[in-house]
Amino acid sequence: MMDLELPPPGLQSQQDMDLIDILWRQDIDLGVSREVFDFSQRQKDYELEKQKKLEKERQEQLQKEQEKAFFAQFQLDEETGEFLPIQPAQHIQTDTSGSASYSQVAHIPKQDALYFEDCMQLLAETFPFVDDHESLALDIPSHAESSVFTAPHQAQSLNSSLEAAMTDLSSIEQDMEQVWQELFSIPELQCLNTENKQLADTTAVPSPEATLTEMDSNYHFYSSISSLEKEVGNCGPHFLHGFEDSFSSILSTDDASQLTSLDSNPTLNTDFGDEFYSAFIAEPSDGGSMPSSAAISQSLSELLDGTIEGCDLSLCKAFNPKHAEGTMEFNDSDSGISLNTSPSRASPEHSVESSIYGDPPPGFSDSEMEELDSAPGSVKQNGPKAQPAHSPGDTVQPLSPAQGHSAPMRESQCENTTKKEVPVSPGHQKAPFTKDKHSSRLEAHLTRDELRAKALHIPFPVEKIINLPVDDFNEMMSKEQFNEAQLALIRDIRRRGKNKVAAQNCRKRKLENIVELEQDLGHLKDEREKLLREKGENDRNLHLLKRRLSTLYLEVFSMLRDEDGKPYSPSEYSLQQTRDGNVFLVPKSKKPDTKKN
């Protein structure tokens, strides 16, 4: 036997390589690739495809977020369907210095500052509407009235309770002052701090309305006046003096000194009383005794008998338009803070205004009333109503001796002011403010394109830019010289205007098509109803004809006789008519008979 030399197992011959290559090509031709048999290769391909898919999803998510952030800076124009950039809010600059300072404050960034609603919520949580100040103010007069009938040994306990109440009031005032300081530290309310200082510097004129509606609890004789008027009535002053003597005899010297020192204590909100009740409070004597009942009754009679005139009201800051010009905001809200808000209808200014000028008709709005106030004819119409004529029997008494000396001077000033102009309502300001408001109202009616064209000083109106034909528009543009911003704005206005006109025409055509389709549908409904009526009428006619035919059939059949003269039975025979009009009697179970009628 011949020994064949085999190649080493690690080496492959050229024939083997060719055979493997042929078999590989055959597998490829049959659609079988290497991945079918190689599991690791299939795993790699699967991982690669998975990574590509995740990367694609990540890119899509990023693109969606970018589109969302991009469209958040634009707003959709409902007329043209375009996305327009959102214009930032512009602060309107007015002529008054107060508004300039307020606009400067408004430009301060507010990331760390509190908002106005948060401040009001903090104020409401800290101090509720029914606070302890009112309850203490109600409790103190009751103790003061009951102290007349207490024994001397109880005066010390009463004095201690009053001192505790005063300490509570002082602590509440300190807390209120701290809260107001925190509110004034907010950038939004910086303008209110300066205005509050200006109001604190000016001396307030005593207002009869404030005196009649509000009493300070620290002044002892206010509550005693009302109680004495109710109980004593029209008794003489000697009874009151006797009452005071008996009261002073009850108390010991120590208690009386403590009580008089308590009444004449200068720390019990004397600024508040001196500011608002200086015309009605008698100056305390050097001895520190209580005011006499004669002075009290005299001041009360002067208060009740005195009449309120328009010139007296004009001296008050709330009714004088000159004082109202100094402040930009209306100090009218219940919380003491107001930012460019109109006065409420429940405020005292409106009540006095309605009593002096008369209530406006119910059909008028606020804007119409402002236009009437600014019109020159309104002064002549409202002039006679501003100063009501007094009857000859009326007696005008001055509120105080100092005011009594200056009464003729104030009357002449009041007449001069009524001849010149009627004071405007407390909430509204004079003619310059209304003019600015009127111009801002006119600017509010302008469109966005008109405002931009006005800002860039474009000499053509927006309607002309949009509606002119192409040749006329090019000729108009060639006559003027424009910069890049003006040209871009004019082209943008014309493009969007044409798009708007095209959209309007498209909507018009759609509406016309809808109306035409509605008309066609209405015609079809009418025709359908007409056909239904005709069908019903035809059915009724057919039913009538069938009934008449059956009646005629029975009549003819009853007239037929056989050879014996007997009538034919309807169950055995029937009548049939041919096309030529002949009628035959045909038996039902047999062939047609030859008898002819």
Curated annotation (Swiss-Prot):
Residues 489-552 form the bZIP domain. InterPro entries: bZIP, bZIP_Maf, bZIP_sf, NFE2-like, TF_DNA-bd_sf. The modification Phosphoserine is found at residues 40, 207. Keywords: Acetylation, Activator, Cytoplasm, DNA-binding, Glycation, Glycoprotein, Nucleus, Phosphoprotein, Transcription, Transcription regulation, Ubl conjugation. Ubiquitinated in the cytoplasm by the BCR(KEAP1) E3 ubiquitin ligase complex leading to its degradation. In response to oxidative stress, electrophile metabolites, such as sulforaphane, modify KEAP1, leading to inhibit activity of the BCR(KEAP1) complex, promoting NFE2L2/NRF2 nuclear accumulation and activity. In response to autophagy, the BCR(KEAP1) complex is inactivated. Phosphorylated by EIF2AK3/PERK following unfolded protein response (UPR), promoting dissociation from its cytoplasmic inhibitor KEAP1, followed by its translocation into the nucleus. Phosphorylation of Ser-40 by PKC in response to oxidative stress dissociates NFE2L2 from its cytoplasmic inhibitor KEAP1, promoting its translocation into the nucleus. It is found in: Cytoplasm, Cytosol; Nucleus. Residues 514-521 are annotated as: Leucine-zipper. Widely expressed. Highest expression in liver, skeletal muscle, luminal cells of the stomach and intestine, lining of the bronchi and alveoli, and in renal tubules; followed by heart, spleen, testis and brain. A motif (DLG motif) lies at residues 29-31. Glycans are attached at residues 454, 464, 479, 491, 561, 566. Disruption phenotype: Mice are viable and fertile but have low and uninducible phase 2 detoxifying enzymes, are much more susceptible to carcinogens and the toxicity of oxygen and electrophiles and cannot be protected by inducers. Mutant mice show an increased mortality during LPS and cecal ligation and puncture-induced septic shock compared to wild-types. They show greater pulmonary inflammation and greater TNF secretion upon LPS administration. Mice lacking both Nfe2l2/Nrf2 and Keap1 reverse the hyperkeratosis phenotype observed in Keap1 knockout: mice and are healthy and viable in normal conditions. Residues 327-440, 563-597 are annotated as: Disordered. Gene3D superfamilies: Transcription factor, Skn-1-like, DNA-binding domain. Belongs to the bZIP family. CNC subfamily. Transcription factor that plays a key role in the response to oxidative stress: binds to antioxidant response (ARE) elements present in the promoter region of many cytoprotective genes, such as phase 2 detoxifying enzymes, and promotes their expression, thereby neutralizing reactive electrophiles. In normal conditions, ubiquitinated and degraded in the cytoplasm by the BCR(KEAP1) complex. The ETGE motif, and to a lower extent the DLG motif, mediate interaction with KEAP1. This is Nuclear factor erythroid 2-related factor 2.
